[in-house]
Amino acid sequence: QNADEGQDLIAAHDDPLVHYFNVPKKSVWDDDAIAAEAASHWERVRPGYARDMSAVAYFFARKLARTIDCPIGIIDCYWGGTSVTCWMDKEALEATAEGQRYITRYREQGGDKPFDQWRQEEDAFWVEMNAWNAHVAQLKKDNPGISWPEINETVGPCPWHPPVGPGSPYRPGGLIETMTKRVVPATLTGILYYQGEDDTAK
């Protein structure tokens, strides 16, 4: 839906050769995650659907299906802004110096704190984050031409990042357990990998 022509495509596209499955974005395996998994299913690309499909995966699948004239099924398993370490199990991380460095940094930042403590910090973070977003939205509504420096001067810088902890989607070795392994062993012909942007500065 965020692609340049996304809204027009969502309203009009109808491709019987392309299906997609969205793995529920869950960083903790709890009752909510179990219910989300039970409700998830394959969808065919048709008008009004695929709003939540990865744009990269959508355009790739559409072109591939037309090129080889064969049905294409895309499993969307991603979480924007995450490190590659979120999608690697701890054994793989511990096997390299780079992986060990991520684990050490995570622990130094308080990643091993009790779950309840992390949950309280996470809830408090989102109260602050949502309030900041609401202030920004109001500023943009009142002054459509306002610049980001002016916004930051008025409401302060964005309070991102969320706290680290045992339920954080950004923790090393987390999403591979709560997302990737939930769709294994699916039979895959290929993989599109474009996670890991968070690692570019590290």
Where in the sequence are the language-model features?
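Cell-envelope and extracellular/periplasmic
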Residues: 1-202
